[in-house]
Amino acid sequence: MALILMIYWAFAKSKWFFYILVAILFGGNLHFRTLSIRFSDPKPEYEVTSWNIMSYNVRLFDVYNSSTEARNKSRDSIVNYIQNVDPDVVCFQEFFHQDRPSSFSTRDTLIELMGYKYYHERYSHRIRNRQNFGICMLSKYPIIAKGDVMFENFKTTDNYCIFADIVKGQDTIRFYDIHLQSIKLQQQDYELFGEKNKQAGSKSSTFRLLIDKLRIAYPARAEQAERVVEHMKTSPYPVVICGDFNDTPMSYVYNQFNTSLVDSYRETSTGIGVTYVGRVPAGRIDYIFHSGDLGAYDFGIQKVAFSDHRAVHCKIYKKQL
């Protein structure tokens, strides 16, 4: 929210830009969470069974692109990227799946190409009894239990959390795939920062609308995060949480997970780690967290984006006692 306010007041040439800038600069350790500094990747020195994990908001594989050629190119690029990384478990947000027969295959293509024999999914919208919109987890290894963490009004907000207990060799890990509430910016909101909206009165009106959306989104995300954390405490296995938090490392939502889990990016990487490449800069909002008895290495962020989010991936292993 502070970043959005800064952008607005910078465009408006308001003195409040300098006030909020000072507040950010003096935010202390809270703001240093956005930056990670590691001098080496903490790859284990002993032989381990590692899990290759990916989290990816695919923005419905660009299914609403009016150009069939562009739509297919986006989907194929996403599928090719996943093939190259070759994750054991991939957690999708904003997932689209069309029942067979399909002219725009997604889930079934991934299953056929990469051998994802096991999956768990949750859809809130189903159009013409064939097109499904929601969240999906694909696994190469057996899922022995699965379920959902239900959010308030999930059918109208399109936000979900699913979990699955997955077995690889002698290890069992509970994976959570989450998509938390977004601000739901519309075209008129984006125009607040562009040249199309030049009149002061119009800017003020749009800005008030934006603040109202923030007031709805922040408490909703907080409540959703709290539900996931409470459910996580009941897990009989180590946990990995993947997802689009729609919030930065400075947020209350991030802190809910960071208090008891390890942020894989900060454990392994150096830099800010930008994952959102949409029209309003948001920095790192896609995460892979894990329990303290697990370790992570070889973290990667997708370099060429085929969605408004970059995929994140890393290898997870169980630490020796």
Provide a role label for each language-model segment:
Residues 1-8, 18-19, 219-240, 245-321:
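Metal-dependent phosphoester-hydrolase catalytic domains
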Residues 2-42:
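Transmembrane alpha-helices and immediately adjacent membrane-cytoplasm interface residues
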Residues 34-164:
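Membrane-embedded segments
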Residues 45-54, 131, 135, 140-145, ...:
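Beta-strand-turn-beta hairpins that frame and shape the catalytic cleft
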Residues 52-58, 77-103, 164, 175-179, ...:
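Active-site beta-strand/loop signature of hydrolases that rely on acidic residues for catalysis
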Residues 55-73, 96-99, 184-217:
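Acidic/histidine-rich helix-loop elements
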Residues 58-61, 97, 126, 141-143, ...:
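Short, solvent-exposed loop/turn segments at secondary-structure junctions
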Residues 150-155, 180-182, 303-305:
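Short, solvent-exposed aromatic-acidic interface loops
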